[in-house]
């Protein structure tokens, strides 16, 4: 069996694990076989503070420990095991004190190194940040100056705005007054023009009505004169046609007796008839279409004249 309980450093590589709170010595300190090598033992402690309270006696060991170490300690007696465990306890306490001392010295050294490093970093930061701090301070001064200029500009702007608003309102009121006066004068002119236009329109309407009335009277008089003239012309033409018909009726027997004379008279009658027809045709616009209806009873004379053959 390999044993490494003789030196303090031999326990630095052992594993310590925290488990449930100890209730017995067996629970407080348990030695188990190592997995890698059965010849070594691994020590598991619940708490280092419990080491001072460990009390060992042969009966406790016999009740709680012997069965766990069989057959490793089958030939060892109780006193040797107790001595070994006490040595282990002392070694653990010594290791604890040494570690506390080493931890104190290390803490002091680390504090010194930290202070030195801190001073170095502060110095480096001061050297690096000084231009930036100066620039920030300069920018702050310029910002204050800009704020002052901005405040002055804002004050002047407000004053200018107030003055401008007053001036604009004054001009608007003056313009409104002029506009009202112009609107009043324009309305007066419009009313005057409307009155003149209405008066002129009424006069023109009266003159137009008078002219229309005069024209109507003149047209009616002209129409009456035309009808009267038509009547006279038609009456005269009827008289002439009647006289011509009587002459034709008078000369028809003579035409039958003397062909030469009849031929001459027939030509003369045809000539006279042609002249009458020409006169009637030229004056048809004055007589109208109905003037020939008044000649219907005597048309047989014209037919006799126009159809009579000259031998």
Curated annotation (Swiss-Prot):
Presence of the UniProt keyword Coiled coil in the record: yes
GO molecular function, one term: structural constituent of cytoskeleton
Keyword Coiled coil assigned: yes
Coiled coil: 185-233
GO cellular component terms listed in the entry, alphabetical order: cytoplasm; median body; microtubule; ventral disc; ventral disc dorsal microribbon
GO BP field: microtubule cytoskeleton organization; mitotic cell cycle
Top-level taxon of origin: Eukaryota
Locations listed in the record: Cytoplasm, Cytoskeleton
Swiss-Prot/TrEMBL keywords: Coiled coil, Cytoplasm, Cytoskeleton, Microtubule
Null allele phenotype: Morpholino knockdown has deformities in the ventral disk including shortening of the microribbon structures and flattening of the ventral groove, and increased number of cells with four nuclei. Knockdown has no effect in the adherence ability of the cells.
Known role: Giardins are involved in parasite attachment to the intestinal mucosa and in the cytoskeletal disassembly and reassembly that marks the transition from infectious trophozoite to transmissible cyst. They may interact with other cytoskeletal proteins such as microtubules in the microribbons or crossbridges, to maintain the integrity of the ventral disk. Involved in formation of the ventral disk.
Quaternary organization: Interacts with EB1.
Name of the protein in its database record: Giardin subunit gamma
Organism: Giardia intestinalis
